Swiss-Prot record:
It comes from Xanthomonas axonopodis pv. citri (strain 306). It comes from the Bacteria. It is an enzyme of class 3 (hydrolase). The keyword Lipid metabolism does not apply. Fe cation binds at C99, H141. Removes the formyl group from the N-terminal Met of newly synthesized proteins. Requires at least a dipeptide for an efficient rate of reaction. N-terminal L-methionine is a prerequisite for activity but the enzyme has broad specificity at other positions. One of its GO terms (biological process) is co-translational protein modification. SUPFAM superfamilies: Peptide deformylase (SSF56420). Belongs to the polypeptide deformylase family. This is Peptide deformylase 1.
Amino acid sequence: MIREIIRMGDKRLLRVAPPVTNLGSAELHTLVADMFETMDAARGVGLAAPQIAVDLQLMVFGFDASERYPEAPAVPRTALANAQIEPLSEDMENGWEGCLSIPGLRAVIPRYRFIRYRGFAPDGSPIERDAEGFHARVVQHEYDNLVGRLYPSRIENFDTFGFEDVLSYDL
């Protein structure tokens, strides 16, 4: 089922979500399916549960090819509960980001280039992966959504913040 995506300005996006405690449950599997369906319908590359007004530390992400980010390499489709992120170096990389909760806008955001993320699959099995580049960016962006942070709070140069159909995408 496609869920409504709440937008910036809704205070529910600014809360720290509590951990998922019902790993392996039918309810969680249904929620994950709804999140993937919602993300795909919105042409997104990631979605956090708080974006559909579900107060849980749960994110989904991944794609083979993205209409919104055509240059991005594929990212494995993943449902990740109770995520933790560890930078693997201090290397930062600037890149364009948008958000399904902030439709029509984008900005250049600095993110760690190399990370390790950990958490749990919906069935309760552990997940631990190293990621770099756009994959790392997507995970960090969705993690921010779990801790009440939206990408505009990370903008360093507001000259790069604007509407998708107006911006020049030269970095």
